[in-house]
Amino acid sequence: MFLVGSLVVLCGLLAQSTAQLAGLPLPLGQGLPLPLGQGLPLPLGQGLPLAVSPALPSNPTDLLAGNFANALSGGLLSGGLLGILENIPLLDVIKSGGGSSNGLVGGLLGKLTSSVPLLNNILDIKITDPRLLELGLVQSPDGHRLYATIPLSLKLQVNMPVVGSFLQLAVKLNITAEIVAMKDNQGRIHLVLGDCTHSPGSLQITLLNGVTPVQSSLDSLTGILTKVLPELIQGKVCPLINGILSGLDVTLVHNIAELLIHGIQFVIKV
């Protein structure tokens, strides 16, 4: 009987001690006891990992503008834009006036040939090193249209005996394409090309190398190129854009078109 009573007292003391110890912090550097074979105590100063809330998914519309710009850029490159620009017979176009009086630049170039003797002294003009730079994308204030800026750079190698050497000119030009959403008679949504033209004032022509020619000759050449190049390059880029829009991913087209139709802004700056 005495032994049973002693055991009861001992168990009570142990239970009380355990309860008191449960309220005390663990000694510094001592981790929670783990079952054998299930790991080591946590390193000094490292507590138990806190529960982390899953990251909220980003707004899907945030990705649309970037995906669309990438699709346009990739389409222009895969469509052979750079090769098309490099193979433009620029001198023939200039001297032929675009092929006819109703051609790309009308009868302007024919008049230039007769009025500017410099053209008759140019043996060749070649387009080299064409590049497509990073596209820009903005949305109209009313949210119903997109404007894609297609920045291009290239070099012109001009063979002019009157100068005595090759001239190399750097050219930069932006083409701006308006893109709108349309529904056909069957209710299907499409992205279509609106206005497509060179951006006014975006043409830059810079002399890169060689002996500086007589200023009047350089001014005359620059004046001719300023009248010819923008429309010529525009005529190569815009049809490609039109074809790219008709071949874009259906889901991408639908998502963008829905936002444009309802005037929802989704382009911040691309």
Curated annotation (Swiss-Prot):
Upregulating conditions: After bulbectomy or lesion of the olfactory bulb.
Molecular function, one GO term: lipid binding
Signal peptide: 1-19
SUPFAM superfamilies: Bactericidal permeability-increasing protein, BPI
Major site of localization recorded for this protein: secreted
Source organism: Rattus norvegicus (Rat)
The protein, known as: BPI fold-containing family A member 1
InterPro entries the record matches: Bactericidal_perm-incr_a/b_dom (IPR017943), BPI_fold-superfamily_member (IPR051902), Lipid-bd_serum_glycop_N (IPR017942)
Expressed in which tissues: Detected in adult nasal epithelium, heart, lung, spleen, testis and salivary gland, and in embryonic nasal epithelium, lung, salivary gland and thymus.
Organism lineage: Eukaryota, Metazoa, Chordata, Craniata, Vertebrata
Pfam family, any one: LBP_BPI_CETP
Intrachain S-S bonds: C196-C238
